[in-house]
């Protein structure tokens, strides 16, 4: 799990720093609406919708907001969103993947390209960096849900590929094909997880100096602040001192 804690810290910067709850709720609602529109409005029968609702509850999104986002999917005036993936290289040649839900792909591409150019990076073609990441499912539980041994035993029995336990909680990784079944099995034993999601996990991470790291973290913050960008993944490590300095 090289660079694991750094990967987690960088991915969670947005969750800790985003003071604009309305923007965060808007992104969560957009994912809920898209998930409900593509499948069924019943989360018991729609794994993507269920995962989106879990993410919303983890951020204390009001129940009314969640229900309204689901209902919006069946309305005649429901907005149509394109699901896109952008890939590129940031400062220091660090690989970055962005998952986007947008109602204007030209605007999204233009904005993201501008962010990369201004940061000294460049936006590439789809597939230009994703080969350096694994597409995995992750299920997360708080540390007090189970001991590390009990979680490991249950996860392996459910078909998980890897388990990382620590003070911050339990992270269970499984293949894209099996992680929904793994999540369901663990929920039957430990209750609802705090997170169930498909992610892009870097196969390896590269250490960068503080100057490059600061540029990268600023770029990631810019991307996360964009209304259309749902998730950002990158394959770098920075010093704990820099993370602390920037509030990571």
From Swiss-Prot:
**Residue ranges of the region described as Disordered:** 1-21
- Where does the sequence pass through the membrane? none
Organism's domain of life?
A: Bacteria
Recite the UniProt keywords alphabetically: Cytoplasm, DNA-binding, Transcription, Transcription regulation
- Signal peptide start and end residues: none
What would be an example GO MF term here? DNA binding
Pfam families registered for this protein in UniProt: TACO1_YebC_N, Transcrip_reg
Q: Which GO terms describe its biological process?
A: regulation of DNA-templated transcription
Localization, per the record, is: Cytoplasm
**Which Gene Ontology cellular-component terms appear in the entry?**
cytosol
Q: Which family does it belong to?
A: Belongs to the TACO1 family.
Q: What is this protein called?
A: Probable transcriptional regulatory protein Nham_3525
Originating species: Nitrobacter hamburgensis (strain DSM 10229 / NCIMB 13809 / X14)
Q: What is the lineage of its organism?
A: Bacteria, Pseudomonadati, Pseudomonadota, Alphaproteobacteria, Hyphomicrobiales
